[in-house]
Amino acid sequence: MRTRALSLAALLALTALLPLAATTLQRLSVDDLVGKSTGIVRATAAPVSSFQRSGMIYTTYRLQVSEALKGSPGATVEVAVPGGDYRGLHQSVAGSPALRPGIEYVIFYWTGPSGTNYIMGLGQGLFEVHKDPSGEVVLRRRAMSTEVFGADGREPDHGLTLRWKELQVKAARQAGQ
């Protein structure tokens, strides 16, 4: 009986730790993304490699830049995304995006102290490029699979659609300040 009680206590203790693995994000508005990012690029991505830093695995994507709205990335820029495969280990991070080769994106990124670039707010800074029926370029961000908190507390995330021209104007205004 004592063994069963100890087993149950251990199981409950482990279950209590499960929520600690969740990802919680602060909601970033388009103005936040524009203002706080190091760079904004329209680009096509390809996975390059993975690495491990402080126990966390990252996948690095090389972005073939077609246009830069902020920063000076050159023809290519690399961004690291939490999660991936490294030396036989796999790590998943809730809310971390996986870029698909051949898909055109607009990516808001920031540069860390080590010089590594990261997508803003995990997937919040990643938009797929599409054209609407009239031919106008629109950017779509998928709904986040993690908890997102705004000024009023927890808010459901439904994704975001933004017109390319609108983003160009916002980025130009911010650059002029």
Regions found by a protein language model. Give the residues of each.
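Bacterial N-terminal signal peptides that target proteins for export
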Residues: 1-10
